Amino acid sequence: MANVMKAPKRQLTYVTDLNKCIGCQTCTVACKKLWTTGPGQDFMYWRNVETTPGLGYPRNWQTKGGGYKNGELQKGKIPPMIDYGIPFEFDYAGRLFEGKKERVRPSPTPRSAPNWDEDQGAGEYPNNSFFYLPRMCNHCTKPACLEACPNEAIYKREQDGIVVIHQDKCKGAQACVQSCPYAKPYFNPVANKANKCIGCFPRIEQGVAPGCVAQCVGRAMHVGFIDDTNSSVHKLIRLYKVALPLHPEFGTEPNVFYVPPVLGPRMELPNGELSTDPKIPLAQLEGLFGKQVRDVLAILQTEREKKMKGLASDLMDVLIGRRSADMMISPLT
């Protein structure tokens, strides 16, 4: 029998403008320092920023399966530890304080890591391209992890829609790890329990923005309640319709959205002629965000041109985010 989920009264929602993310990993570090420094959590990055196109973290997560197909829950694969990147250490003491002269090498020898293929992208100069894709638990409207859990340890908070794993009820079945198509629940081998992003709900309860959002140096991230018509997330998703979920075909109805990137045209064709083709192939963006991305890119281009001509654009003003307080719950860190 499927677990019964009570619909929340409100839904906390995130939007990231991929045109402003600089890949600095400040959100990654903020989350790591706040939530995953305990035993068995070395390999966990509840929030990570990966280069697209690329293998991602864990490696090849986009093909692991899970989610829903025709409304039916799908079983995916549990990523092996090597796909997350086995944590490695440097002999800092030997090099810095004991006078060892040989080259310091990490141990064990690294084979993968959360940002293993950072900045590689695809294509050949001068038409090579990539962009950064920050990822976290999507706190889905239809969370596959919740339905899959055999111990009813996962629930969606009534007051804000954040999806949480009840640590006392979790028995380490890993059904959530298997069923999430975004690979965002993690199995803690020390505690024998699943861990995942908690949406910084202790901060939300105090009226403070999540750590990842508050620390974003590029003001690329927005957070708020989707029913708040004054919030930037409502405006970007519902009013201007320029923010899209990642892989909507997975069927979980994510509550983390993205403004797709616009990198402009290719520099030149193989024959040396100038090109008007987009540097990021449209098919690549459609593979991530669905067919609607074409319409969104057209809207963004139109509004950008308005600004360039000195005309008003409410949408661009929201995306510029001159005041952090307009983009999030209190930005206090």
Curated annotation (Swiss-Prot):
Component of the perchlorate reductase that catalyzes the reduction of perchlorate to chlorite and allows anaerobic growth on perchlorate as the sole electron acceptor. The beta subunit may be responsible for electron transfer to the catalytic alpha subunit PcrA. [4Fe-4S] cluster 3 binds at C137, C140, C145, C180. This is Perchlorate reductase subunit beta. One of its GO terms (molecular function) is 4 iron, 4 sulfur cluster binding. Has potential use in bioremediation of waste sites contaminated with perchlorate, a common component of solid rocket fuel which is a widespread environmental contaminant in water systems in the United States. It comes from Dechloromonas aromatica (strain RCB). Heterotrimer of alpha, beta and gamma subunits. It holds the Pfam family Fer4_11. GO terms for cellular component: membrane; periplasmic space.
